[in-house]
Structures are given as structure tokens and as C-alpha cells.
């Protein structure tokens, strides 16, 4: 293998680069630096988001490690939208489109300055996916290191029942219950989110950070090491050291195996989704993994995910589907332990590697605490425990668990023999209501309602869904149909966390269903079907459903069906096509800005990851 010229040489070498060198010198670079790889650090610090509020200085930790290892670090920032704060109002329209803004921003900065490599400091819902999309586009050496999960909240009583521990979903559900008075609600919200970090359950942010481990693009422990623990600092330092080593191998030795598209191959994407099925990850991960595959030109689609969901069992249930939180997953050995159980059961592709290990076997032998050969470093890492102190400071505790959770029968991470279900935690549904597919987080659905038949109650916005629930118009047996909330129809594909949490708070969690061409928060549980494709704005059948129509949802049979005749469907379709404004909401009043209209004009449906289609 031959050496490859640094990308940055166009700005650092030769007479024609004198102007660029002059500007680099103004940033502090020297003659010696012009011979080294320039490594971009994409940070996402903001004071708006608890998952990012602690990231202000962590770029310096990465930069120091890069500098010491022989690289030249250069940091920049991206935006970060907090889905929880944006939830329930017009702010949520901006969440998914922000993924594309982040992808573009990273690409613009890296290519605009001809950087040689990239470290992505991400954490919350759209930031990790946005940076992942950019990394797959750029295909230069990259390492992901996230801000880490929040600690779970302390126990409080809600409606006479002790919630131990609490989290964001506890607070939202409590707000919808008439039995929770103002003082009790204050106690819940004050306890739910005690520290910096991404919300403490297996919600979208933590799910995606776990998946970067399985894709091979981050270091072991990235998905589960708490934001508040000193061990998290080590991950930032190692990320800096690792990226310089990847640069040496690629540019110095011509070793293209270190590039993202050669690490995150189709086989790695299959492993990542196998992990997702096993850990009961957020349904949003389907959207983001499909998008990343498209950006990297990887042959991986919704059919691939459907096949995996039939073959991979659910080995872990974490909040909102149980009382376990990410700190418990970490105590159980984190992502390497889940991957280890899948590996021993023959559920993973072995021919993959990562930014830290040459083979999957080597990776899991060293880092899976159940392998029998785990390193002392791994054992020490997974002993990292919460501090139990309210704080926005990272690395502020060195607490240790007294023991690890290696109970494969009833612990936080089970083996295949003791799996919760033989199928995965995420299921792809099809039928006349979802010809191109829909997604349900089966791990969050009580098995007693895996087959559900009900009558449609149609609304055309998330806001209207909230109103009909809080006004007690939703009754047992209803299927709440929320349409025109897809990528183009919203636009922006809003999350339906408030409607589902309010259904749960109203005691209807097992009595009703909610289906939508929008999406759900990673904190959603219950019979909630999202990502219906094609969406209403693109002529999907969901746009023709009327109040009272019978609908069948069957998780076992993977079915989502509107039970009316083909003749009636065609009659309604012809009527819609002949209307003044076909495939648009009839009563909804919503201000849509130019920025959102630009996204809507290019947005594809959820089955393609809601990426933009640019011709």
C-alpha cells in the first residue's frame, strides 16, 4: 500500500497555498504543523440542551490528545435541537430537518477547509444521526464520541405509586393524569432529569450512540458510560489518540480499511440493527440508519430491517419499557455484552472491524465482560456508577458499582435462551395502510394487545391529537389516526411523544392505539405505529381514512390494514384527486417557514429515511 497525500496539502503546500498558510498561521499554526494531518473536531455544545450543556470544554480534551499524538486539531460547532423542549409545539417541526442542517454544516466545514479527518462530539437525537450522515458522505477517517447518558432521577411517588427511578417520560405522563396534583407534579419534574447528559432511558439519543459502537465508528462504552463519570473523560482522550492513528494508517500507509464506508459496511449495518432489535432501541433509529446507509451508498433498506427483526430476539428492555436505565445497561457490560450474546448465538456478521479492533472476535473478547477474557480496562470501565448528585458538570464522579450485573437469565441483559421475545424489539408492519412499510417498537407494547382491532378517530396534526385526548374524546377501542405529519406533510415529521404519553397518563395505554405518518420519541411506549409510508402528503392511504373506519394492527402478523372495500378506497381516492387541494390537511392552520418548505420540497418518505432527494 502506498502513502496517500493529505487532503489538507492543497492549503498547506506549495507557492499557491501562501494565502491559505497565512490564514492558518493566524490561527496559531506553524511550519511544522503544515506537515501534519489537520483534524476537524465537530462539537455540538449548547446551553439549550442538557445532553450538550457539558460539552463546552471537552473539545479541548480531544484536541490535546490529537496534538500530543501528532495531529493538528481544529474545532467548530454545530447546532443541536432538544426534542424534549421542542416537543408539543411548532418547535418540533424543526427537529428532523435539523439533522440535514447538521450534516450539511459538517460537510461544509470539513470540505471547505480540506480537513484530513474528523472527530464527532455528538449526543442527542438528531446530532449523532446528522454527524453520521456527514461522515458517510465524506468518507475520511472519523471517530464518534458522544456526551454520554444522563443519570436516572431519584424515586418519587406518582398517583400513590413509587416510580423508581424517574425520567423525562415519568414527568410527561404525570402531567396528563388528573390524579397528580401540582405539588406532586413539581416533585416529579424536579427529580426526572438530575444531571447533564442525554435522557437516561433507551430513547433515541442513547440508542443512536449505542449503534455507533456496533457500526464500528466509536469506542467501547460510548453508548452507556455516564456523562457525569470520570471514565467518560478517558473516551474523549482516546478518541483524539485514535483518530491520529487512523490518519497515520490511511495517509501514511494507504490503508483504506480505516475509512467509514469500509468499516460501516452492509454487514456492519446489519450488526447495528441486530443490536437495535436486541436492545429494544427507539423506532427513530430505523429512520436514521436508513438515512446513513443512503448517504454512504450502502445497500441496506427497510426490507433488510424487516428480515433482521424476524431473526433477532429482544434481550433487553430499558426505560420506557422497564425500570432499567442506561446506567443499568452499563453495569451489565454495555453494548459489548449485548453484542457478545448475539455473537455466541450466531446472530452477527463476523467479517467486520472497527476504529479500535481488527476483528469482531478480538473486539468482543476484550470488551465483553461475559467473554471470560475481558481486559482489566473493560472490567473497570463497566464498574462506573452514577454519582447521585444534581449537576451539569461532566466527569464529576468516580463512583463504582460494587458488582457487575452478569445475570443472563433475569438481569438487564439476557442471553438468547431467556430472551423477552424471539422477535426483535422493532417490527416492520405492512398492509394497505403501509404499502411501503411502517414501524412499531414491539418491545414497548404489552403482548396482550399485539393484535388490536379498533375504530379510527382521525386528526390532522399532533396538536389536535393532544386536544382530543385531553378533552377525553378518545375512548377504549379507538385507533387515533394522526396524518399529514410525515416528512413532507408536516413538514418535518413531528414526534408524537405528548399524545402517547397523555394516552398513558389517561389510563388508555392498553385500550387504544395511535398510528401516524409522523414518528415517535424514543420514550414512546404502547401500541404506537409510526413512519407510515407512503405518507398522506404523498398520496398514502392514511390520507383517505375516515372516522369510524375499522383498522387492524397485528404485531405477530406484521399487519396494518384498513378494513374497507377496494371499491370504497378507489371512490375516496378519486374524490380526493378531484378536490381543490388534494393530499393536504383540510382544517389545520400552521405557519410553515421558507426553511421548512425547502425541506418539504425535497423530503422523501420514512421508508427511505426521510432524506432529501436532490436531482
Curated annotation (Swiss-Prot):
Catalysed reactions, as listed in the record: (2R)-2,3-dihydroxy-3-methylbutanoate = 3-methyl-2-oxobutanoate + H2O; (2R,3R)-2,3-dihydroxy-3-methylpentanoate = (S)-3-methyl-2-oxopentanoate + H2O
A Gene Ontology biological process term: L-valine biosynthetic process
One cellular component term from this protein's GO annotations in UniProt: cytosol
Binding site for Mg(2+): 83, 125-126, 495
Annotated metabolic or biological route of this protein: Amino-acid biosynthesis; L-isoleucine biosynthesis; L-isoleucine from 2-oxobutanoate: step 3/4; Amino-acid biosynthesis; L-valine biosynthesis; L-valine from pyruvate: step 3/4
InterPro entries assigned to the protein according to its UniProt record, in alphabetical order: Dihydro-acid_dehy_C (IPR042096), DihydroxyA_deHydtase (IPR004404), DiOHA_6PGluconate_deHydtase_CS (IPR020558), ILV_EDD_C (IPR056740), ILV_EDD_N (IPR000581), IlvD/EDD_N (IPR037237)
Cofactor: record remark: Binds 1 [2Fe-2S] cluster per subunit. This cluster acts as a Lewis acid cofactor.
Keywords for this protein: 2Fe-2S, Amino-acid biosynthesis, Branched-chain amino acid biosynthesis, Iron, Iron-sulfur, Lyase, Magnesium, Metal-binding
MF-aspect GO terms: 2 iron, 2 sulfur cluster binding; dihydroxy-acid dehydratase activity; magnesium ion binding
EC number of this enzyme: 4.2.1.9
Active site per UniProt: 521
Residues recorded as bearing N6-carboxylysine in the entry: 126
Binding site for [2Fe-2S] cluster: 124, 199
Record-given protein name: Dihydroxy-acid dehydratase
